[in-house]
């Protein structure tokens, strides 16, 4: 994350009201938390920088940080799930957000945390603690406002 100017001092501090129930157990979650086998312990600005890296096809300034091949593969449907690439959700199939381009892709984290890449409009949208049934509506509103 140093190469994209992300902060190096951010720490996890759970919010007072960030408790979730998982399998009957109360678990504290934080936006971008990594309790569940993956995740990023970063703030919203750093999430946006991460998204910008992928919006720019793996380039940061004049330096390639992620290969073209990786970007291509991560945004192609996987064999087992047309709505999933390499660790990114795709706007296809059963996860399609109606009225939005199929080339949109996004990272989705526990607790309603999203980093959405909208290539056609050169947008990165970071959403925190949003109901997963509402994220498509939010993206549509942002895209429509950007037109």
Label for each model-derived stretch:
Residues 1-17, 45-48, 53:
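Active-site-adjacent helix/loop patches that line small-molecule binding or acyl-intermediate pockets
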Residues 107-147:
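Structured C-terminal helix/loop/strand segments within mature extracytoplasmic catalytic/sensor domains
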Residues 8, 13-34, 38, 42, ...:
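Active-site Gly/Thr loop motif
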Residues 57-58, 146:
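A general structural signal marking secondary-structure boundaries and capping sites
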Residues 1, 48-55, 71-75, 89, ...:
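Non-transmembrane alpha-helical segments in soluble domains
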Residues 12, 64-69:
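Beta-strand segments within the central parallel beta-sheet cores of soluble alpha/beta enzyme folds
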Residues 41-45, 132-133:
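Soluble non-cytosolic domains of exported or imported proteins
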């Amino acid at each position: 994350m140093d190469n994209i100017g992300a902060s190096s001092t951010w720490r996890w501090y759970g919010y007072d009201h960030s408790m979730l129930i998982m399998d009957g157990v109360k678990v504290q979650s934080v936006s971008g938390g990594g309790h569940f086998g993956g995740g990023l312990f970063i703030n919203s600005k750093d999430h946006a920088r991460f998204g910008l890296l992928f919006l720019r096809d793996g380039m940061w300034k004049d330096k390639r940080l992620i290969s073209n091949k990786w970007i291509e593969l991560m945004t192609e449907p996987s064999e087992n799930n047309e709505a999933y690439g390499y660790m990114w959700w795709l706007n296809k199939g059963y996860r399609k957000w109606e009225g939005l381009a199929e080339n949109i892709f996004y990272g989705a984290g526990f607790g309603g945390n999203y980093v959405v890449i909208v290539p056609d409009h050169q947008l990165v949208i970071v959403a925190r603690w949003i109901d997963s049934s509402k994220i498509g509506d939010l993206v549509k509103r942002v895209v429509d406002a950007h037109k």
